[in-house]
From Swiss-Prot:
Signal peptide residue numbers: none
Protein name: Putative acid--amine ligase YjfC
Class of enzymatic activity (EC top level): ligase
Organism (species): Escherichia coli (strain K12)
UniProt-listed Enzyme Commission number(s): 6.3.1.-
Length: 387
């Protein structure tokens, strides 16, 4: 893995506008950063990214299978008891999932380490699957990278294939909250993939969902919603006043209820418990448990429910705060994880996001930040394969 500078396309703003990339600049700061690119060899991708992703995902599914049979685990995950049985039912029925993203730290001279699994509402999808590929095609044409360069990116192909597998004559609804540009773009992109698969689709904001007779969900025209993709956290749905309606399983949600076990930072201590010493895992433990690291080693504290680095704190071996990100999750239960520093290139720390669609590893995106904690504003940098 090498990073090098590349020229920015002179008409980048127009290209972004033409392709609906409305958030390539966030708060007057660069989000999509194509002034640099990462180069990987095919062997690095296959052995260090794709293969571990596939193995870790299967391990995660084993955790789900154990968790739905163990009330102690569900308690540690802070999942409300009201939903334990319906989550287990969702798993037994193999309610279909769509996608997820594993976040890795990789320094190049040791196996990748899994930091967390964003299995419910992962973003940076559009830029990983689509806009990054546009960059590759332009970069090859202009000669700034080898003309035979490739990219680890079959994300869009797999998404369309997955929507084909999920095809139904009933419309597929796509939902997110209002006033969230990145979420809206992600949902529109997924909706487009569904349409390419021949699936009728409709968009509705979460705030516009209605309740019909008997507690069915309806759209603004009072049509009953039977299937919906929601870029809205499962734990928020469970905590909502109407959350108990999830128990009736009238709608098919994507992501399904069993994903609440994987979209939880408590997954990390469970993986370490069931697969101790695995080369791609970091020692992790729940608050109140015996630390799984030696005295004097650095560690990270994370809320069980947290997104985009919110309320994550890094401590050194003397319990001094090294870095901290503010957020809205300070009151959530906490887990602890051995600290794995991100590789540093110049003034930036690099995080690899490895994508999974329907249980298959299929691509990646790279984020950079000037701090050790990756956030929603962290820059996205394209990659390519050569050699």
């Amino acid at each position: 893995m090498l990073r090098h500078n590349v020229p920015v396309r002179r008409d980048l703003d127009q290209i972004a506008a033409d392709n609906g990339f409305d958030f390539h600049i966030i708060d007057n700061e660069i989000y999509w950063d194509e002034s640099r690119a990462y180069r990987f060899t095919l062997r690095q991708i296959e052995e260090q990214i794709e293969k571990p992703t596939a193995e870790l995902h299967q391990m995660c599914l084993e955790v789900v299978d154990r968790a739905v049979k163990d009330e102690e685990i569900l308690t540690q995950l802070a999942i409300p008891p009201l939903y334990w049985d319906v989550i287990a039912e969702s798993w037994r029925a193999r309610d279909p999932s769509l996608y997820g993203r594993m976040d890795f730290a990789w320094c190049g001279n040791a196996p990748v380490k899994l930091l967390e699994y964003n299995a419910d509402t992962p973003t940076s999808l559009y830029e990983s699957a689509y806009f990054q590929w546009l960059w590759l095609e332009d970069a090859r044409r202009s000669g700034i990278i080898p003309r035979d360069a490739d990219q680890y990116n079959a994300i869009q192909e797999r998404l369309i294939s997955r929507f084909s597998e999920l095809y139904s004559r009933e419309p597929f609804y796509f939902c997110c909250c209002q006033d969230t540009d990145e979420d809206r773009s992600t949902v529109l992109y997924l909706q487009d993939c569904a349409q390419q698969a021949g699936q009728e689709s409709r968009f509705i904001y979460i705030e516009d969902l209605g309740l019909g007779v008997g507690g069915v969900l309806t759209d603004l025209d009072d049509n009953v919603i039977q299937r919906a993709f929601k870029l809205y956290p499962l734990e928020w749905m469970m905590r909502d006043d109407n959350g108990p309606l999830l128990r009736k399983r009238r709608e098919q949600w994507v992501e399904p209820l069993w994903k609440s076990i994987l979209s939880n930072k408590g997954l990390m201590p469970l993986l370490w418990r069931f697969f101790p010493g695995h080369p791609n895992l970091l020692a992790s433990w729940f608050d109140g448990e015996k630390p799984q690291i030696a005295a004097g080693e650095s560690y990270v504290r994370k809320p069980i429910y947290s997104r985009e680095g919110g309320n994550v704190t890094i401590f050194d071996g003397k319990n001094n705060v090294v870095d901290h990100a503010d957020g809205d999750y300070a009151d959530e239960p906490m887990i602890y994880q051995a600290f794995q520093p991100l590789p540093r290139f110049g003034d930036s720390y690099t995080l690899i996001g490895s994508w999974i669609v329907d249980d298959e590893a299929c691509g990646m995106g790279i984020r950079e930040d000037n701090t050790l904690i990756t956030k929603d504003t962290s820059r996205f940098v394209p990659h390519y394969i050569a050699g």
